[in-house]
Structures are given as C-alpha cells and as structure tokens.
Amino acid sequence: MEVQAEQEFEGIVEEYGDFVYNLTYRVLGNHADAEEAAQDAFLSAYRNFQRFRGESKVSTWLYRIAVNAALMKLRKDKNKRTLTHSGYDDLQLVSPAEGPERLALNSELREHLQQGLDMLTDNLKTAVVLRDVQGLNNEEAAEVLKISVSSLKARLHRGRVLLRQHLQEYLNQHRQET
C-alpha cells in the first residue's frame, strides 16, 4: 500500500476504531471477543482498502466488514460461548437512586436481554443490534446487511417479537415472585 493510502487508512482506524469495537461488542457480548473481531475487521479492511471504490460511505463499508468479522467469530465460537458480560452497561433501565433492589433487577434484566439476543438467529440478531442498539436507520442497516429495506423490516419484526416474548416470560415470572 502506498504511503498516502496508508495514512488515509490510519485516519480511518483512528476515526472509526471505537465505532467498530462497539459494534462487535454489541454482537458478541464480551470484551475479548469484541477486540479480536475488531482487529480482524480492520485487518480485512486493510487488505481490501485499495479495492474500496467509494461507492458507499466508509462507515457503511466498515459496518459490513465488522458485522462479518463478528458473525464469523460468533459462528466459530458458538459451541463454546458463554455469557460473560451483558454488553449493555450503558443502558440505564432504572435510576441508581432507586436502591440496591432496583439495581439488582436492572442487572438481571440486562442479562435476560442479552440472553434474548443470543437466542436469535444471526440474521435477526444483527438486524436488531444495528437498528435498535447501534441506532442506524432502516436504509443504513439494510445497506450494511446488503438486503432490501423490506427484508430488514421483516427481520426486525421477527427479532423484536421473539425478544418481547423472552422478556415478557421473565417479567411474568418476576411478578409472580414478588
């Protein structure tokens, strides 16, 4: 790779490093796997940087590569995966002022949310993570996944229904216990 292209790529890594890590973390659910997938994504992007033609935004191109890296890691490790971290530390479900009981419930709810995501197929999970966790709009998420917007909407609907059912079962059980 020529010097100018290397400098340009270094700028991309600097600008999008956290972004790629956060995406892989949301898909994989733990720091070590997310770091490995993010490194794999940037290695793949580096190898293919000269073929990037600028037909899409750099962020979209990196999303696709990062999603692929995370999904490859997920498939490779599927049999030995365990839930080591919820991946939703920044999700504030209750106020810390609510007390230790509410904080424990918050942590438990996060765990069940991650379990619900983990039970989804890769296609459904990725659609939900891109749209509902990463905050992409429908067009951006569809472009990253290389599917139509209507296909994305169908995946989102199925994924959300399954997540809702999973969380509803937990909430019903929790209500019976209290």
Predicted regions and their residues:
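A short, charge-rich alpha-helical start-of-domain segment used by transcription regulators
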Residues: 2-22, 46
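Sigma70-family region 2
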Residues: 2-3, 42-57, 76-77
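Arg/Lys-rich amphipathic alpha helix in sigma70-family domain 2
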Residues: 64-85, 106, 169
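DNA-recognition helix of helix-turn-helix
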Residues: 67, 71, 145-168
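Internal acidic/polar
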Residues: 80-103, 137
